[in-house]
């Protein structure tokens, strides 16, 4: 219920305040509300609210999966460097593409956003593939966690080097993307994003039984017939893909606002 309340507040509040009744009429197609208000709701605030809702669901599931694997309430996709991988992918496109840099990509509009999204997905999945490979070679979760943190630092170091050789305009474009925002997702992008997440989120529910067994500890889970390495591979892959898609569309955002208070 609180999510719905916050969602409607997002539709009502802003630089232009729109009465709640008018927002309801616009969504339901009732009444004759000003065209300006209709454009604000349909083209800006509603896509932003739906994107935040779906992205939050995806990152919450991803965070839960990582917390279960490492049995640590502070674990998350960013710990394994997956978010840093997405940032690195975008950095290669924006900072090293010369005439196709951040300024030119912004002028391409939708196609520019698609290019950034693809770069973020490739970067995230590249780091995730490395993590998956390492997960098959190491036994302890703590070792894998440390390696993931190291990969994240390496990715950030690469980004720093790319910034050093880039022009001011491209660096500014990259920094804006790196702030993370739901507002830059257009209506068409939002529909594609929601469609992809509508497939990925139900698929992640198939791992509920596996996650419950992993909560018992590796010893108990193994005695109950669970293949620990295979389960860890599936969970990390699921968390990585969810994070990659969200980061591609929304930028590097944190999955849990209350994490700093734990």
Where are these regions (language model features)?
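Alpha-helical transmembrane segments in inner-membrane proteins
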Residues: 1-261
């Amino acid at each position: 219920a609180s999510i719905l309340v916050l969602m409607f507040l997002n539709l009502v509040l802003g630089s232009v305040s729109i009465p709640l009744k008018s927002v309801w009429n616009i969504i339901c197609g009732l009444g004759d509300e000003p065209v300006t208000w209709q454009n604000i709701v349909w083209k800006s605030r509603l896509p932003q609210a739906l994107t935040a809702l779906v992205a939050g669901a995806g990152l919450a599931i991803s965070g839960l999966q990582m917390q279960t694997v490492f049995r640590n309430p502070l674990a998350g996709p960013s710990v394994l460097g997956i978010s840093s991988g997405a940032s690195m992918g975008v950095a290669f496109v924006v900072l090293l593409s010369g005439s196709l840099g951040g300024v030119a990509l912004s002028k391409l509009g939708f196609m520019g956003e698609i290019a950034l999204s693809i770069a973020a997905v490739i970067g995230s999945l590249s780091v995730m593939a490395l993590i998956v490979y390492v997960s098959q070679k190491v036994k302890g979760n703590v070792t894998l966690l440390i390696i993931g943190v190291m990969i994240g630092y390496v990715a950030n170091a690469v980004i720093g080097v790319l910034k050093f050789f880039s022009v001011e305009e491209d660096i500014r474009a990259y920094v804006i993307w790196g702030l993370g925002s739901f507002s830059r997702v257009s209506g068409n992008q939002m529909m594609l994003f929601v469609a992809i997440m509508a497939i990925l989120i139900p698929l992640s529910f198939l791992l509920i039984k596996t996650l419950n067994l992993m909560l018992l500890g590796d010893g108990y889970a193994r005695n109950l017939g669970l293949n620990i390495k295979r389960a860890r591979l599936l969970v990390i892959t699921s968390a990585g893909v969810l994070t990659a898609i969200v980061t591609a569309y929304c930028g590097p955002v944190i999955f849990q606002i209350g994490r700093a208070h734990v």
